[in-house]
């Protein structure tokens, strides 16, 4: 929802994920947006509002790219905070990450780096199978079934 709202506000087609990602890949520069995680739960309301306040009709293409980069960076920050919270609560050795967010190359790379740094095994579906969270549920179920024999 966060990605689509920002993308549409920038004039991108809906769903906006791949279009916003294309903008984000045009730069490494950005002005940070907040990330919000409380008790292991992510809220994108604040980051989305902050991003929406930056959007105006006179934005240059590079400003749009920087905002897109900031959006995905804030999502990555939130994901890392959430995972860190949960791995402190429970012993975790593996992470299954599937859904629309994991079809994004920036977030996928970020999760790979985070998991490697924190000695977590990362299981992800191929990007074309990560466009919808229903895929994530199916992937997780298949993984559990396989691990139980």
How would you label these PLM feature ranges?
Residues 12, 92, 120:
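Short glycine/serine/threonine/alanine-rich loop segments
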Residues 95, 112-137:
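Conserved phosphate-binding/catalytic loops in two-lobed NTP-binding clefts
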Residues 39-45, 50-96:
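Adenine-nucleotide phosphate-binding core of ATP-dependent small-molecule kinases
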Residues 47, 107, 134-137:
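Residues at alpha-helix caps and immediate loop-helix transition turns in enzyme cores, especially N-
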Residues 51-52, 57, 106-120:
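Acidic-glycine-rich active-site phosphate/pyrophosphate-binding loop
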Residues 1-62, 143, 147-149:
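A short helix-loop
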Residues 92-111:
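Glycine-rich phosphate-binding loops at beta-strand->alpha-helix junctions
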């Amino acid at each position: 929802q966060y990605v689509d709202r920002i993308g549409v506000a920038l004039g991108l087609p809906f769903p906006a994920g791949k279009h916003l990602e294309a903008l984000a890949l045009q730069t490494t520069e950005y002005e940070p947006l907040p990330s919000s995680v409380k008790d292991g739960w992510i809220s994108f309301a604040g980051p989305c509002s902050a991003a929406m306040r930056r959007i105006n009709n006179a934005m240059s293409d590079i400003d749009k790219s920087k905002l897109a980069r900031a959006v995905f960076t804030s999502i990555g920050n939130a994901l890392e905070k959430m995972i860190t919270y949960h791995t402190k609560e429970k012993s975790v050795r593996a992470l299954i990450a599937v859904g629309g967010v994991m079809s994004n190359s920036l977030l996928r790379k970020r999760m790979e780096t985070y998991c490697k740094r924190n000695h977590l095994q990362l299981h992800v579906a191929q990007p074309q199978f990560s466009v919808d969270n229903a895929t994530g549920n199916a992937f997780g179920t298949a993984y559990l079934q396989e691990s139980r024999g």
